[in-house]
UniProtKB/Swiss-Prot annotation:
UniProt-listed HAMAP family: NDH1_NuoH
UniProt-recorded name of the protein: NADH-quinone oxidoreductase subunit H
Subunit structure: NDH-1 is composed of 14 different subunits. Subunits NuoA, H, J, K, L, M, N constitute the membrane sector of the complex.
GO molecular function, one term: quinone binding
Protein origin, superkingdom: Bacteria
Organism: Chelativorans sp. (strain BNC1)
């Protein structure tokens, strides 16, 4: 009995505590990411943005949270009630589950598994089911159209993201997210006399794939200019049009958690994760988790800027970009990376 408690119960409780702590930190982080998103968009449009609730509007997201929670959920009369209520739980739950393997610093992950990037990719692929369930269960044409668009869009851009991951796998030789970060200590920067610097990170050596991954991440998370799933001018709110109260909040939460997840993946795969930009003081004095958060925020800032000034694509343009531009380029980069590693004897 004592060995059972030591081997299973205590590790299980530790994982549970880590998971709860991660979810709380994520929810608070998403609240301020949303605040930053609205502030950046307002600044581009020469507006003030949220500025009433709390100092400088810092508590606006929490006010919105209480507003949604205390509203009455309305379920359409023709909707499939069970699936209708399950869909937002699936969307938010999968977005949170993907964070289990994300290392914010060395050793700072709930599960440091050897197929970490594959796990994240699999979970991200499943997130479309929440949208499809919502579109079908709402028994309305606008949510259903939004759900169909979402399925086609996510499948199209997951192909390109998959090839980006294959390229990184070839360059690193591991699917472990911690190994991917640590492999970025040596690269082009070492060759030019700046070892362990930002020039060693994959963004430079795999620059075309960095751009493809960033743009595909926008499409994967339904961010502008690829927000055709919930295009306000056509579908109002897409698959979320019939939702209100807490179910709507869960969809909204899942969407922003997925956005932050993609920013974290961009940081890990291409921007050195928690590694400092230079391997000397004072840069090395800063904890790795701080560097990780700063890089994540910088990537999100780019997400927000794209939302602010890039117009929405047409649906045919979105599909053409994914299948006729990104797919051939990413496939060529996989072959080119493999050939380079083979002929230089690096594998």
């Amino acid at each position: 009995m004592e060995s059972f408690v030591t081997l299973y119960v205590l590790p299980g409780l530790l994982i549970l505590l880590k998971s709860v702590a991660l979810i709380v930190i994520l929810l608070v982080g998403v609240a301020y990411i949303l605040y930053a998103d609205r502030k950046i968009w307002a600044a581009v449009q020469l507006r003030r943005g949220p500025n009433v609730v709390g100092p400088w509007g810092l508590f606006q997201a929490f006010a919105d949270l209480f507003k949604f929670v205390f509203k009455e959920p309305v379920i359409p009369s023709g909707a499939n009630k069970g699936v209708f209520l399950l869909a937002p739980v699936v969307a938010a739950g999968l977005a949170l589950a993907a964070w289990a393997v994300i290392p914010v610093s060395e050793g700072w992950a709930i599960a440091n598994i050897n197929v970490g990037i594959l796990y994240v990719f699999a979970i991200a692929s499943l997130e479309v089911y929440g949208v499809i369930m919502a579109g079908w269960a709402s028994n309305s044409k606008y949510p259903f159209l939004g759900a169909l668009r979402s399925a086609a869009q996510m499948v199209s851009y997951e192909v390109s993201i998959g090839f980006v991951i294959v390229t990184v796998l070839l360059a690193v030789g591991s699917l472990n997210l911690t190994d991917i970060v640590l492999s970025q200590r040596d690269g082009l920067g070492t060759m030019v006399g700046l070892p362990n610097s930002f020039l060693d990170w994959h963004w430079l050596a795999l620059f075309p794939m960095f751009i493809i991954f960033f743009i595909s991440a926008l499409a994967e998370t339904n961010r502008p200019p690829f927000d055709l799933v919930e295009a306000e001018s056509e579908l109002v709110a897409g698959h979320m049009i019939e939702y209100s109260s807490t179910p709507f909040l869960l969809f909204f939460l899942g969407e922003y958690v997925a956005i932050v997840l993609m920013c974290a993946l961009t940081t890990i795969l291409f921007l050195g994760g928690w590694l400092p930009p230079f391997d000397f003081a004072p840069f090395t004095w800063v904890p790795g988790v701080v560097w990780f958060v700063l890089k994540l925020v910088a990537v999100f800032f780019m997400f927000a800027l794209v939302k602010s000034f890039v117009p929405r694509y047409r649906y045919d343009q979105l599909m053409r970009l994914g299948w006729k531009v990104f797919l051939p380029i990413s496939l060529f980069m996989v072959v080119a990376t493999a050939a380079f590693l083979k002929f230089t004897g690096l594998v």
